[in-house]
Amino acid sequence: MTDFEVVVVGAGPAGAELARCLAQAGVSVCLIDRLPHMAKAAFSSAALPLASIDRFGLPAELLAARWCGWQLLSPNGEWHHWQQSQALGAVLDFAALRQWLTAQVQILGGELMLGCTVTACELERSGMKLITHMRNHKAESSSIRSDWVVDASGQSRCLIAEAGTNARDPLLLGVGLEWLLEVDQNSWQRWSQRLSFLIGSNWVPNGYGWVFPMQPGCLKVGVCRLLNPNKQAGPSLGVLQKKVLGLLDLDGARVLDRHGGLIRSRVGRSDCHGRGRLLAIGDAVSTANLLGGEGIRHAMESARVLAPLLLANLAKPNNLIKSYKNKLKCQLGARWNLSGRLAQRTWQKLHTNQADQRMEKLLQGLKHCSAADLSELLFNYRFERYGLRALPYLFGMGGRSKSS
């Protein structure tokens, strides 16, 4: 049986970034993923601010297009625009990102096992090692041994499951689909250099639609919604997607790829971060930003938080799980927790005229902000720039908010 210091299950941004950091530090690490290659199931809108691209050292070849502005279609059909001359961020080629991260793991000496599904993880009799069992695409079984196992399997939480989670912490579930379209130059120009969103119950009840530029001649168009347990499901995502394409005069574009996915997150982020020698990162511990609908940054950030703690523990055992949970919460900040509550209030309630009117008020209030200010709001949760007392009311939280 092969031995490693750390086994990481899931080669998405969180798992691959953790494996990359550990391999770079000389740790014997094995990265496992059920996909046969990283170009498959590349579901992510993958818009990142420039600061995150620099922080994670992502090379230029991963950037499909840069953006320097925003445009939002409001519930009443009015487009709102925010633009500046300097780039604010980039849309990544998500498949290329995953391929690059996993290639880096191998270059740095880590082991990569693709096309393998982890079936179980158990403690060895000695109590000092974990045995990870898996099955490859030929249904052949094998096992490996390690000091630590990290569940980076995303919303499926295939190993950590729901043990230790606060049952009173609301679980938010979202579904989305995205199509990669081939368009003519004029159509591409119309949507280039900005991130575009459609917000309102007329377009996508309980969610929103989007158009992101990719390489010249390509656009990513998608819809997503937060599931509302108290409301009967509305039109399917496929129906909503076709409606959005027709509204934007993109229904005649050639579809190059279709993909979709599920996102789960707990409002209070009470997920179990680890037990024994099993840890969890990324979407498995609700790192996603559900208000802005993006998860790559925080997933990779969770890897950056855990990596040095694992290195220290391998050298000298300590109370890793408690330190990890506290440091991650500190790194992502209090505003990150507030964003989860705002996401729940915003998207789950966005299916009535009253909710549309609140959204109209919010967009009117943002009219005089700069493009950079809007980025600070959606990516860094700088709510106070727009009046912390007013925002909860506009999002439908009701009553007075206490100042922080």
Question: Language-model segments: which ranges?
Answer:
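Short beta-strand to alpha-helix junction loop
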Residues: 84-103, 227-235
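FAD/FMN-dependent oxidoreductases across multiple families
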Residues: 227-310, 314-321
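Predominantly flavin-linked oxidoreductase catalytic cores and closely associated redox partners
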Residues: 21, 104-250
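N-terminal Rossmann-fold NAD(P) dinucleotide-binding loop
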Residues: 15-16
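C-terminal helical "tail/cap" subdomain of flavin- and related membrane-associated enzymes
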Residues: 308-404
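N-terminal FAD cofactor-binding segment of flavoenzymes
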Residues: 35-72
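Glycine-rich FAD pyrophosphate-binding loop
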Residues: 21-42
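Beta1/beta-strand and adjacent pyrophosphate-binding region of the FAD-binding site
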Residues: 1-12
